[in-house]
């Protein structure tokens, strides 16, 4: 409530089923158009094109949902995938590239902050974005820093053409 009072931010909950209804209305033509964007933007390093097409469907539907509701930032969570086969990782990547804030695991504060940072850095490619990173090996001399297990890494962070590689979890 305080962030709404101080900054005018609203933190609304929408049932995932409402988004799924929109995603299920996405046409094959819309998916094909999004896939064309993907093949222009990414190197396809997978034979699992059905999984990538599912991501394209999610991106089209999510963008429609956000636009229709005037939403400038969003979060998702592993615990709430009702009606979805996967998390919308590529959608999150590309929507961040369009200035939409993102936060993982339902973290509305990070999604709002990332939206503000993206607004501040408009016109400066790769200036900001979100990556859920961590350091998980603290063995002296073998420290591993800036590892990420999430799919939402913005393509703007890449030094070369980013790749789509679909790998099984586990």
Please give the residue ranges for each predicted region:
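Internal metal/ion-chelating core segments
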Residues: 1-68
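Anaerobic metallocofactor- and corrinoid-dependent redox/one-carbon enzyme cores
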Residues: 2-7, 46, 54-170
């Amino acid at each position: 409530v305080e962030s709404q009072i101080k900054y005018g931010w609203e933190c609304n909950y929408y049932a995932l089923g409402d988004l799924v209804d929109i995603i299920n209305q996405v046409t094959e033509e819309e998916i094909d158009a999004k896939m064309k964007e993907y093949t222009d933007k990414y190197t396809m390093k997978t034979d699992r094109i059905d999984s990538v097409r599912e991501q394209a469907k999610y991106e089209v539907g999510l963008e429609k949902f956000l636009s229709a509701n005037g939403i400038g930032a969003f979060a998702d969570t592993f615990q709430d995938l009702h009606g979805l086969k996967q998390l919308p990782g590529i959608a999150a990547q590309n929507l961040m590239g369009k200035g939409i804030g993102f936060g993982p695991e339902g973290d509305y504060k990070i999604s709002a902050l990332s939206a503000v940072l993206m607004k501040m850095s408009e016109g400066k490619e790769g200036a900001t974005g979100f990556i859920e990173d961590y350091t998980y090996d603290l063995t002296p001399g073998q420290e591993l820093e800036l590892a990420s297990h999430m799919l939402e890494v913005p393509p703007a962070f890449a030094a070369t053409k980013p790749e789509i590689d679909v790998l099984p979890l586990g």
